Amino acid sequence: MAKAVTVKIKLVSTADTGYFYVTKKNSRTQTDKLSFKKYDPVARKHVEFKEAKIK
């Protein structure tokens, strides 16, 4: 079997609330770490989410 191109990643809130999103990315085309501004329902505002590995 071939190695999977898409990998699951976790987007962790930088507001230190512990909230995270799980998404996937193409590891061949997106080699750098992802970072998005998304809504954090615990902080109740839009904050930056940074990529982390799923353990």
Swiss-Prot record:
Gene3D superfamilies: Ribosomal protein L33. Pfam families: Ribosomal_L33 (PF00471). GO terms for cellular component: cytosolic large ribosomal subunit. Keywords: Ribonucleoprotein, Ribosomal protein. The keyword Ribosomal protein applies. One of its GO terms (biological process) is translation. GO terms for molecular function: structural constituent of ribosome. InterPro entries: Ribosomal_bL33 (IPR001705), Ribosomal_bL33_CS (IPR018264), Ribosomal_bL33_sf (IPR038584), Ribosomal_zn-bd (IPR011332). Belongs to the bacterial ribosomal protein bL33 family. NCBIfam families: PRK00595.1, rpmG_bact. This is Large ribosomal subunit protein bL33.
